[in-house]
C-alpha cells in the first residue's frame, strides 16, 4: 500500500531535551571503535579547546529517540517497518557536540518519492540547544520496499 503523502512537511519536536553525557559519548566511541582521546579523555578535550568531551560526528543518531513522535512512527503514514531498509544518513555539524549539551530535536518528513516499486522517505533533522543555538542538521533516507503506487 502506498505511503500517505499528506505527511510530507509534517514536523515533530522533542518535548524533553536530549542530555549529552560523558559516559554516553565514551560508550558510543567504544561501540564504533574510535580511540580518539577527544571522545574519551576530558583533559585531552579541554587541552584541545573544548568545554568537555567531544561526541563523534555520528553520535547524533543516538539523539533521535523512537519516542520523539517522528512522522515515520505515526501509523497513519502507512509505513511497515518490516519492509524498510536504511538508505542513507548525513549530518552537518555547525559546532562540535560536547558533554553537557542539552539538545532539542526537530524532525520533518521532507519527501516521499517513488523509485521503481519502492518509496524513499527523507526525514530532515535540526539539533538545537535549549537556548536555540543550531548545533547540527541531518537527513535520513529510508526505503520502503514494494509500496510504491502502481504506474
From Swiss-Prot:
GO biological process, one term: fatty acid biosynthetic process
One Gene Ontology term of the molecular function aspect: (3R)-hydroxyacyl-[acyl-carrier-protein] dehydratase activity
SUPFAM superfamilies, per the entry: Thioesterase/thiol ester dehydrase-isomerase
Record domain MaoC-like: where: 8-127
Residue spans crossing the bilayer: none
Family assignment from sequence similarity: Belongs to the UPF0336 family.
UniProt name for this protein: UPF0336 protein Franean1_6066
Organism: Parafrankia sp. (strain EAN1pec)
Amino acid at each position: 500500500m502506498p505511503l500517505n503523502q499528506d505527511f510530507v512537511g509534517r514536523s515533530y519536536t522533542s518535548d524533553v531535551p536530549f542530555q549529552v553525557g560523558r559516559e554516553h559519548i565514551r560508550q558510543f566511541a567504544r561501540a564504533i571503535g574510535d580511540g580518539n582521546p577527544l571522545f574519551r579523555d576530558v583533559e585531552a578535550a579541554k587541552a584541545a579547546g573544548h568545554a568537555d568531551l567531544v561526541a563523534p560526528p555520528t553520535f547524533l543518531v543516538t539523539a533521535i529517540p523512537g519516542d520523539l513522535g517522528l512522522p515515520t512512527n505515526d501509523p497513519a503514514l502507512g509505513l511497515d517497518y518490516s519492509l524498510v531498509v536504511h538508505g542513507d544518513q548525513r549530518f552537518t555539524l555547525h559546532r562540535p557536540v560536547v558533554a553537557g549539551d542539552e539538545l532539542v530535536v526537530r524532525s520533518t518528513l521532507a519527501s516521499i518519492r517513488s523509485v521503481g516499486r519502492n518509496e524513499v522517505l527523507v526525514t530532515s533533522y535540526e539539533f538545537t540547544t535549549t537556548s536555540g543555538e543550531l548545533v547540527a542538521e541531518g537527513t535520513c533516507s529510508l526505503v520502503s520496499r514494494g509500496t510504491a503506487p502502481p504506474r
